[in-house]
Amino acid sequence: MILRRANSFRFVVAALALAFAFALPAAAQNDNDHTLEAMQDEMNRSVARLQLPGQQKPFYIQYRILDVDIRSISASFGDLISSTHTRNRFMSVGVRVGDYQLDSSNFISQDGFQGSSSSAGEVGIDRDYNSLRQDLWQATDFAYKEALVNLSSKQAFLNSLARAPEIPDFSKEPPVVDVQPLLKSDWTSRNWEDEAREASRVFRNYPDLYGTRLHYYIVYTTYYLLTSEGTKLRISHTVSGIEASLSTQAIDGMSLHNYYSDYAQRPGDLPHPKDVSKSLAQVAQQLEDLRIAPDVSDYEGPVLFDAPAAASVLAQTLEPSLSGARPPLSSVPQFDQMMQQMGAHGDWGGRINTRVFPLNVSLTDNPTATTFQGQPLFGSYDVDDEGVRAQRVDIIENGILKNLLMSRRPGPDFEQSNGHARSALLSVPQPLSSNLVFQATNTLSPDDLRKKFLDICKSNGQQWCIEIKRMDNPALAAQTQQDFSDIISGIAQGLSSGDRLPLMVYRVYVSDGHEELVRGAHIKGLDLRAFRAIAGIGNDFTVYNFMQNAEAGITGTALDTFGSVEGGIPSSIVAPSLLLEDVELGGFHGEPRRLPLLPAPSLQ
């Protein structure tokens, strides 16, 4: 049964607001930005006149423009490797033919996937009127003709089915007007090159680390959206981050790596070099310790996930099931089989009002929140990338699934968007989390949770059990092609079974609680079913900020979930330590690489 929301009142309010709001863009032109003016004029012409003889007119047109201004600095051992400043402007034009019930979108044919018929590319960076109109005109013409072909192919496929889907293709939403002032880029308030030099100098203390890179990113973006329904947006945003990758080899040749990341909305909120150096020294020492740590052996039993590790695992396992959007129709049977094998279809579709988590657990996603218990959240926004107001979504209430994240692509359970369509670099917006908060009652202090963990180990007759303090992030850690290939091969072996990649893994001995670091572990087959019965939940709720992959949710792996500042989506997840009673770990079974013939040179 479709759960519907009444939108009539919202549409009336929005219509009244539009009369006043459309005056905003004219005032915005005082900043010499003619983007919205060019978009509006070409939109008016397309709505009035775009039609091939004997063919349907478009019922929906959207123009998306993204200005990106990036400062990127890389350093190692106290010296700069690169320092660049890049400006780009990207355009995407989407055209839909048909109607809200059945249109030209969301169809996979032999020619590929059509989210909505679109034309995309780079345009001039000067925010001028004439060249942008020219680009929009050509892109709109191409997208319209493509939409007609797509709708014809889609209708032919639907006619071949015994029963065509009844779910609409596109939801009706009230238009939103939000034209914000442009942000002025600030590159001089702090000397970022000197900070990168100073922070990376700590790597000189670790000559056995073969690859070390420290990256500073400061990104200013301005997003424009104009639709034929009346939505008009100009939203400026800042994202900044520090990311580091470190790699080496164990004595037996096993490839090892580690990473560091810290993110902030504003550049001025990034940590200062001394704090960065201290954190880099910690992850470098962890990597040094891994070089001499013993291999992990195969294991099955209780696992204690510290809060950062629990947050990472939840991000990977939850994301594929949070979306309530309908998968695209496909005339290619192999595609659906492949997506099923990769775990791309979520576990929660069609399960509204059923228990999916323990009864003491709730889960919310709230893009309008900016802090959690005084800690800043990284995934906040006011309007999503389809022009829908951001909304808090109570996904799980007391263990019962109540809601899912929605874009304007309806699904079997919900037809309306709840403002969660997100994208990176004008990719097709997908329903993705923003600030995801795992909540629970009957929680335990860290000491009590650890005692329960050891008690379970003892009752199982085990001499030691496993604690995971940190999970891997391949998007940051893999800096070389060989590193990337090693990680890909490891992930590929467990795509359909839910294998996970822990980084800092410890044996905890029951006799006295002492810890022993081990290396080479991977978690076997950990999926959402493992969280239906959680043995213990800590009260140490921790904010875990990360860059989410724009295609998160396809396979539910670390590589699929996490991204970098350069092309990811700001996100947060709040999670406590979690104790799972039955987790399986496997050891390293790959081929080690040859060690360098000579030792690393001494560093001055």
Where would I find each of the regions flagged by the language model?
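Active-site bordering "gate/hinge" segments
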Residues: 27-388, 392, 397-400, 413, ...
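N-terminal secretory signal peptides that target proteins for export/translocation
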Residues: 1-9
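Dual-mode signal for accessory low-complexity, basic/Gly-rich regions
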Residues: 337-604
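Hydrophobic alpha-helical elements and their junctions with loops/disorder across both membrane
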Residues: 21-26, 53, 154, 462, ...
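Long, low-complexity, intrinsically disordered N-terminal extensions of eukaryotic proteins, enriched
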Residues: 2, 26-27
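Low-complexity, intrinsically disordered short peptide segments enriched in small/polar/basic residues
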Residues: 9-10, 310
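Bacterial N-terminal signal peptides
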Residues: 11-23
